[in-house]
Amino acid sequence: MKKLDANQVSDIISLSPMQEGMLFHYLKEPDSSLYFEQISLHVSSAVHIAAFQQAWRHVVSVNEMLRAVFRWEGVKAPLLIILKELPDFLRYVDVSAQMTADRDTFVANLLDEDRANKFDLREGAFRVSLYK
C-alpha cells in the first residue's frame, strides 16, 4: 500500500452502506470477482492515443468516485479518500506487431491477465487499457 501524500487528497468521507458491503466482501473473499466489471470494445477506426488519454483523464477528474481509495487499517472506521488525481490508471499496449491471426488470441490473453490482476482497494478500483 502506497502512503498517501496529504497534498494529493481532495476529500475524506465515510463509506456509504453499499461501500461498506463492497469492502466486507472484498476482505472476506479477496479472490472473488463479484464487483469486477470488464468491458471490451472494438473500434474499427484509428484512435488518437493522446486524445483518448486526455478524454479519460477528464472523465476521472470530474468523477471523484473514480479517484477514490479505501482505508480501513489503523482507522476507527473505514474511510473513502478522494484523490486529486488518479495516477497510472491508463495502460496502452500496441498489439499491431502481432500476426493478424494471432492478434485476437493475444488480446484475449491480455484481457484474461487484466481480469486476473485483482484490484487493491487501497490503490484504487478503476483502470483503462487501450490495445491498438
Residue locations for each model-derived region?
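Acyl-group handoff/entry surfaces in thioester-processing enzymes
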Residues: 5-84, 97-132
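Short, charged/polar, Gly/Pro-enriched secondary-structure boundary elements
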Residues: 85-91
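Short, charged, solvent-exposed linker or helix-capping segments at domain edges/interfaces
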Residues: 91-92, 104
